[in-house]
């Protein structure tokens, strides 16, 4: 008997015999993934994670994971005729994401909780749940591509650079990548996604995209931290690089590296920027723009996705992205261990902040080689 040709998810069996768990946030992206797979005849199981207390504080436009999102995901499942489950992951989410978020700000870092959520909740616990449900794979609505290479599946940027989410998925491991599918990664624009939603008659076709961190109402992260860590907003001094006191601040957690506005120290001549935070002394250190310039970026907790081990070479020529909103820049990785390295930026970058990710791209290619966490800069 001839082998069955590979289906669109890469399995040698018909779609009807291929079970796929779809991580459904209630937004248009994951809804389209579920609808397309269901329409193609796959055995789809929708799963939505309840990650936070979905009270009035979060029942608003622009936040994911809110109460209405669970309702919307369920409506999509009903429209397309596949089962849908809601799993309570609030305790896991608090321990794996929210607590570290608060502690990072207290340590003077600027965290990216969405990366930790993907790494520690969605692509860990939810992925295991998918396996427990005997699913062949798990699909998400992320804009990123999974391509087969000579050494196995590779992570690649989305076809639509404006929607690319590779920065937030750098910590996806090889084992996870083997099990995951990203059906939207090849689309040229978000308009295509919404057109597919309309074609399937999905109730979320015109739903606004999520913008905020799901557990931070109205973007007021400082209020969340103060609630979690009383005393976190204790006031202190704003000082210059020489230690001269220029003013007072309302809590280190209100400031980020590179910040210029809202310092309350105008009239001092040249513009001043936050160049460092010292939580132990409760000081915000400011200086001229050139003081923000960083070339050497120590990176740890590296997830390396190259074909050869990270330490197999003394140097790697890459393109490095140090913030989600910035373009990758030429850089050299000098490994210290399998999970730690020094990254030299060929051209200095302003505002490199501890707590952000440094993501590695193959020069001239869409492939992602992984990345790590910035823990200090010089």
UniProtKB/Swiss-Prot annotation:
The active site is at residues 117, 214. ATP binds at residues 23-30, 49, 141. Keywords: ATP-binding, Cytoplasm, Disulfide bond, Nucleotide-binding, RNA-binding, Transferase, tRNA processing, tRNA-binding. GO terms for molecular function: ATP binding; tRNA binding; tRNA-uridine 2-sulfurtransferase activity. CDD domains: MnmA_TRMU-like. The keyword tRNA processing applies. One of its GO terms (cellular component) is cytoplasm. One of its GO terms (biological process) is tRNA wobble position uridine thiolation. Catalyzes the 2-thiolation of uridine at the wobble position (U34) of tRNA, leading to the formation of s(2)U34. This is tRNA-specific 2-thiouridylase MnmA. It comes from Cereibacter sphaeroides (strain ATCC 17025 / ATH 2.4.3) (Rhodobacter sphaeroides). The lineage of its organism: Bacteria, Pseudomonadati, Pseudomonadota, Alphaproteobacteria, Rhodobacterales. The gene is mnmA.
